[in-house]
């Protein structure tokens, strides 16, 4: 396995005083694909890195600062992102256009750029082997725990780390995620796989329905082994789904992961829209927090999209227990309630009984601590 290096620095961006600068240094230029937030109010680092990604298919290093989003800071914010890339490139003696920049944290404050550049110098002077757990900790903001995973299938190794807990909503979330594969992938193949994986994972999670200004998800191919693209895609999907679920599990104030599976739809887009409506419903989320198998809220959310549903064909299951199929099944309410109380992952399945398409979204419950945390944390 190629030696990926990382360095950690401190620019004083976090109130806790914890390290807030991460530099990841690849042993050679690697094929990479990135997707960024769809939010029009983009951070300076997103604007800068998007410009590079449009013209560049390879990456040699990336730098992340945590604690300051560098967003709402105008042209100066973009310039600061460029200065961060320049500093990494200068110290590591690599092309500036092979250095990507990412920021996460509080919106609307200028980066103390001199401190950030000193933090980058510190990080680049203390390079060591990539530690997924440590990397996730450095880029975290309101996260309660680090997010990382590793998978191996034959010679194919897939691994990554992420951050995210609030402002989680499809397209994408308040999240950063970086996933690596040792498989050799041409750029167009990687891009196709990346788009598919993104839609099924990070674009199918929600915590609070709030879309962030700083999101990015990158997949980097180290090009060490030849492998079937389908195998590589499966492994990338597995690790990315794990990271996405960890983000949902860490939803601010969350006590449960909610898996919403809408099945037997006439089209995939219909299945997805209905799944997202249920996953985003505050009434569904609060019912789960209260351990209440309230299938009526699920039905109401399912019927709230532009796509019609037939209430006489509709089936609703919680924890595998049928609660509605054109009529209530109150005899299963206590079993469903027990599932909500005892299981960390709550399963909600909706059968439309009209076609063959399905979609899965992951969400979290929402309770008192979400309000407390976000009332006390400046965005």
UniProtKB/Swiss-Prot annotation:
Chain positions of site Cleavage: 173-174
Signal sequence bounds: none
Entry-linked CDD domains: OAT
Subcellular location: Cytoplasm
Molecular-function GO terms, alphabetical: glutamate N-acetyltransferase activity; L-glutamate N-acetyltransferase activity
Gene3D superfamilies per the UniProt record, alphabetical: ArgJ beta chain, C-terminal domain (3.10.20.340), L-amino peptidase D-ALA esterase/amidase (3.60.70.12)
Pathway assigned to this chain's UniProt record: Amino-acid biosynthesis; L-arginine biosynthesis; L-ornithine and N-acetyl-L-glutamate from L-glutamate and N(2)-acetyl-L-ornithine (cyclic): step 1/1; Amino-acid biosynthesis; L-arginine biosynthesis; N(2)-acetyl-L-ornithine from L-glutamate: step 1/4
Catalytic activity, reaction form: N(2)-acetyl-L-ornithine + L-glutamate = N-acetyl-L-glutamate + L-ornithine; L-glutamate + acetyl-CoA = N-acetyl-L-glutamate + CoA + H(+)
Active site residues of this protein: 174 (nucleophile)
Key word Magnesium present: no
Homology family: Belongs to the ArgJ family.
Name of the featured protein: Arginine biosynthesis bifunctional protein ArgJ
Biological source species: Aquifex aeolicus (strain VF5)
Lineage: Bacteria, Pseudomonadati, Aquificota, Aquificia, Aquificales
Gene that encodes it: argJ
């Amino acid at each position: 396995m190629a030696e990926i290096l990382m360095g950690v620095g401190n620019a004083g961006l976090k109130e806790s005083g914890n390290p807030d600068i991460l530099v990841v240094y690849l042993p050679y230029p690697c094929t990479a694909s990135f997707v960024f937030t769809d939010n029009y109010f983009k951070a300076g680092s997103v604007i800068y890195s998007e410009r590079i990604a449009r013209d560049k298919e390879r990456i040699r290093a990336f730098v992340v600062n945590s604690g300051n989003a560098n967003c709402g800071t105008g042209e100066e914010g973009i310039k600061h992102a460029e200065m961060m890339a320049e500093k990494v490139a200068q110290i590591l003696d690599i092309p500036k256009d092979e250095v990507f920049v990412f920021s996460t944290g509080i919106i609307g404050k200028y980066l103390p750029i001199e401190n950030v550049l000193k933090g980058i110098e510190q990080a680049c002077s203390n390079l060591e082997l990539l530690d997924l757990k440590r990397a996730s900790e450095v880029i975290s903001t309101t996260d309660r725990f680090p997010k990382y995973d590793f998978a191996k299938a034959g010679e194919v190794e897939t691994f990554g780390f992420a951050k995210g807990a609030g402002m989680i909503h499809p397209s994408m979330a308040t999240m950063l995620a970086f996933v690596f594969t040792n498989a050799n992938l041409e750029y167009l193949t990687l891009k196709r796989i990346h788009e598919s994986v993104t839609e099924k994972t990070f674009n199918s999670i929600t915590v609070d329905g709030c879309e962030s200004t700083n999101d990015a998800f990158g997949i980097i191919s180290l090009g060490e082994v030849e492998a079937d693209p389908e195998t590589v895609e499966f492994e990338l999907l597995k690790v990315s789904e794990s990271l996405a679920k960890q983000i949902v599990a860490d939803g601010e104030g969350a006590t449960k992961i909610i898996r919403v599976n809408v099945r037997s739809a006439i089209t995939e887009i219909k299945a997805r829209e209905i799944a997202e409506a249920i996953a985003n419903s505050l009434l569904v989320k609060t019912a789960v927090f209260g351990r209440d198998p309230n299938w009526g809220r699920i039905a109401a959310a399912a019927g709230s999209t532009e796509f019609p549903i037939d209430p006489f064909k509709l089936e609703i299951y919680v924890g595998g227990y049928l609660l509605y199929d054109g009529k209530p099944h109150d005899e299963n309410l206590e079993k469903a309630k027990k599932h909500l109380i005892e299981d960390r992952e709550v399963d909600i399945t909706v059968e439309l009984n009209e076609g063959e398409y399905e979609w899965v979204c992951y969400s979290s419950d929402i309770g008192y601590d979400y309000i407390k945390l976000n009332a006390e944390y400046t965005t």
